[in-house]
Regions:
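N-terminal FAD cofactor-binding segment of flavoenzymes
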Residues: 36, 47-96
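Active-site-proximal substrate-binding core of FAD-dependent oxidoreductases
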Residues: 331-337, 349, 353-398, 515-517, ...
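N-terminal Rossmann-like FAD-binding beta1-loop-alpha1 element of flavoenzymes
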Residues: 17-43
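FAD-binding beta-loop-beta segment adjacent to the flavin cofactor pocket
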Residues: 304-335, 458-469, 482-497, 504
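Glycine-rich phosphate/pyrophosphate-binding beta-alpha loops
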Residues: 116, 329-342
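Predominantly flavin-linked oxidoreductase catalytic cores and closely associated redox partners
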Residues: 120, 124-125, 129-292, 350, ...
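C-terminal auxiliary extensions adjacent to catalytic cores
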Residues: 394-450
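Iron-sulfur cluster-binding cysteine motifs and their immediate structural context
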Residues: 488-519, 525-548
Length: 552
C-alpha cells in the first residue's frame, strides 16, 4: 500500500535492495552490495535525465571513501585527475583581503591529497562501475511515493509515473509507473529529499536531534584566460559581501582545461528577509581578486543546491523499518571542510555491508540498527563530531567566534581527541527569519552581464527543463499564506531566496498574487527549507525533468 489513497493498479518488481538516488551514496551502496554478492538483485533509481544530471557539488574530494570502496580506482580511470596543488583561505573586505596562514589551520582543514573534481562525472563513472557488476541503474525514474507493508514498514517505492495533466487528472498518455519492492530500501536522495523527509517524520527519526541546518550553494563553471589558470589551485573566502547579514563564504577551484569552479554558500539561518543569496554571489565576483581572475573569461554553466550543515547535533537516526538514509539525506557534511561526498560514499558502503549481513541471515524489512551504530561510532561520526562546534558558534556568535573558538575546538579534537563542550544550533532556518519591519532593505548592485548575471539568464545555463503540462511540483499547504504571511509579514523572501527565480509577487496591495514559475526550478529545495510559514512543499516532478548539469 502507499500513503496516497489512489486506486491505480501498478505492476511490481521485486529486488533484494531498492536504492533511490544515483549520487555518490546510492551508487557506493549498489557497488558494495554487488561486490559482496554478485547474485544480489539491486536497482538504483535516478530522477535526472541521466546519472550526474542533478549532481551539484564543489567539489574537492577526499578520496578516503573511494579508497575504501574501489581501492584500484586509479587503474580503472576514475575522473580524479586534478590533485590539489595549493590551498589558501582569505577573509575579505570590500576591496582587500587577509590571508589566514595555513599553519594556524587545524590539520583536518588541509586539502593535501585531495582532488578537484566534477562530482557529476564521478557519479557517471561510479554508475559505469555499478552496471559492470550487474546493478540495474534507471535514470529518468522519479520515485514519487513510498510503499508500505501491512505492518507499516517501508517495502518499496512508486517510480516512473508520467502523464498527469496540470490539474492532477490522468491525461491521454498517462503511464502509472510501477512499484519497486525491496527487502531493504535505501534513500540516497540528497539534501531534503522528499521521501527522506517523509520517513524522518513518519518514524520520528529526528526526535533526539536538533533541527537540521542548511545553506544554499550556488556555482558557476567558468573558462578563464590560460595565463590565470593554475590546475589544482583551491581558494576559500569568508566575510565580504555577506558581512553581518548572513554566514557563508566562497570557493574557487581550478580544474583542468582552463576551467574554474566559482561557488558561493549562504547559510539559511539568516534573520533579515531582505537578504538575497543569489545577488550576494553575483556581487562577490566583483571583488578585485575575483574580477582579475574572471575578466576575459566566459561563464559556461550555473547551478544551485541546498547543503546540510547541522552535522553531528542534527544527525537523525539513519535506520527505519525497512530501510536506511544515506549521505546527505541524513546530513553528513563536514561544514568547515566543506566536504560531504567522502562521508556519503562511506555511508553507502556501510549500509551495503549491514544489509548484506542481514540478508545472509534471512532478515528483511526490519530496522538496520547496526548501520546507525556504524554511522555514529565509525569514521563518519568521528569526522562530524570533531567539527561540531564550528557551525553553531558561527550562527550564534558570528564569524570571529567561529574562527577562534571553533578553531580551538577543532585543535583540541586534533590533539586530545575530544572537546569539552557542544554548542546547540537553536532554531530551524525557517524560524530564524524575522519580520521585515525589524530590518532594513539591502541594496544590491545590478548585474553587469559580464561578470555578474541576472537569475533568469543564469538559469538558462543550468539547462533546466520541465514538461509544463504536468502538475506543479511545488505545492502550497495554504494558497493564501504566500500573500498573507510571506509578503505582508516578511516582505516576500521567497522572491529572493530562490536562486532560480521560481517565485514572484505580481500586483500590489489587495491585488497582490503569488506566482510559481515551476519550470525554472533547479531542485535546490531552498523553498522547502527557508519558507517562514513552512507552506511550500517540494515534491518530485516527472522523471527526467529539472537541470541537466554538464561537468558540474
Amino acid at each position: 500500500m502507499t500513503d496516497a489513497a489512489d486506486a491505480i493498479e501498478r505492476e511490481a518488481m521485486e529486488y533484494d535492495v531498492v536504492i533511490v538516488g544515483a549520487g555518490p551514496a546510492g551508487l557506493s551502496a549498489a557497488i558494495r552490495l554487488k561486490q559482496l554478492d554478485a547474485d544480489r538483485s539491486v536497482v538504483v533509481l535516478e530522477k535526472g535525465s541521466e546519472v550526474g544530471a542533478h549532481i551539484l557539488s564543489g567539489a574537492v574530494l577526499d578520496p578516503v571513501g573511494l579508497d575504501a570502496l574501489i581501492p584500484d580506482w586509479r587503474d580503472r580511470g576514475a575522473p580524479l585527475d586534478v590533485p590539489v596543488t595549493s590551498d589558501s583561505f582569505y577573509v575579505l573586505g570590500e576591496e582587500g583581503r587577509v590571508r589566514v596562514p595555513n599553519a594556524v589551520m587545524p590539520p583536518l582543514m588541509s586539502n593535501h591529497g585531495n582532488y578537484v573534481v566534477s562530482m557529476g562525472n564521478v557519479c557517471r563513472w561510479l554508475a559505469e562501475q555499478a552496471e559492470g557488476l550487474g546493478v540495474e541503474v534507471f535514470p529518468g525514474m522519479a520515485a514519487s511515493q513510498l510503499v508500505f507493508d501491512d505492518g507499516g514498514r517501508v517495502k518499496g517505492v512508486v517510480a516512473g509515473e508520467f502523464g498527469r495533466e496540470a490539474d492532477g487528472s490522468i491525461g491521454a498518455g498517462y503511464e502509472p509507473g510501477m512499484e519497486l519492492h525491496g527487502r531493504y530500501v535505501m534513500l540516497g536522495e540528497g539534501v531534503r529529499g522528499s521521501l527522506s523527509k517523509q520517513v524522518i517524520d513518519r518514524f520520528d527519526l529526528a526526535a533526539d536531534a536538533e533541527p537540521q541546518k542548511y545553506g544554499i550553494g550556488m556555482k558557476e563553471l567558468w573558462e578563464v584566460d590560460p595565463a590565470k589558470h593554475v590546475p589544482g589551485k583551491v581558494l576559500h573566502t569568508m566575510g565580504w559581501p555577506l558581512g553581518s547579514n548572513a554566514g557563508g563564504g566562497s570557493f574557487v577551484y581550478h580544474l583542468n582545461d582552463n576551467q574554474v569552479y566559482v561557488g558561493f554558500v549562504v547559510h539559511l539561518n539568516y534573520k533579515n528577509p531582505y537578504v538575497n543569496p543569489y545577488l550576494s554571489f553575483q556581487q562577490f565576483k566583483h571583488h578585485p581578486m575575483m574580477a582579475e581572475l574572471l575578466e576575459g573569461g566566459k561563464r559556461v554553466s550555473y547551478g544551485a543546491r541546498a547543503i546540510t550543515e547541522g552535522g553531528w547535533q542534527s544527525l537523525p537516526r539513519t535506520a527505519f523499518p525497512g530501510g536506511v538514509l544515506l549521505g546527505c539525506a541524513a546530513g553528513m557534511v563536514n561544514v568547515p571542510r566543506i566536504k560531504g561526498n567522502h562521508n556519503a560514499m562511506l555511508s553507502g558502503k556501510a549500509a551495503a555491508e549491514t544489509a548484506h549481513a542481514a540478508l545472509e541471515e534471512g532478515r528483511g524489512s526490519d530496522t538496520l540498527t547496526e548501520y546507525d551504530r556504524e554511522v555514529r561510532e565509525g569514521p563518519i561520526g568521528k569526522d562530524l563530531k570533531a567539527v561540531r562546534n564550528v557551525k553553531p558558534l558561527w550562527s550564534n556568535y558570528g564569524l570571529t567566534a567561529s574562527l577562534t573558538v571553533g578553531g580551538a575546538s577543532m585543535w583540541m579534537n586534533n590533539i586530545f581527541g575530544w572537546s569539552p563542550f557542544t554548542n546547540a544550533h537553536g532554531k530551524s532556518d525557517a524560524d530564524s527569519t524575522e519580520p521585515a519591519k525589524d530590518h532594513k532593505v539591502i541594496e544590491y548592485p545590478k548585474p553587469d552581464g559580464v561578470l555578474s548575471f541576472d537569475r533568469l539568464t543564469n538559469v538558462a545555463y543550468s539547462f533546466t527543463n520541465h514538461e509544463e503540462s504536468q502538475p506543479a511540483h511545488l505545492k502550497l499547504r495554504d494558497p493564501d499564506k504566500p500573500v498573507e504571511v510571506d509578503l505582508k509579514i516578511y516582505a516576500g523572501p521567497s522572491a529572493r531566496y530562490c536562486p532560480a527565480g521560481v517565485y514572484e509577487f505580481v500586483g500590489e496591495g489587495d491585488d497582490a498574487r503569488f506566482v510559481i514559475n515551476f519550470q525554472n526550478c533547479v531542485h535546490c529545495k531552498t523553498c522547502d527549507i527557508k519558507d517562514p510559514a513552512q507552506n511550500i512543499v517540494w515534491t518530485t516532478p516527472q522523471g527526467g525533468d529539472g537541470p541537466n548539469y554538464p561537468n558540474m
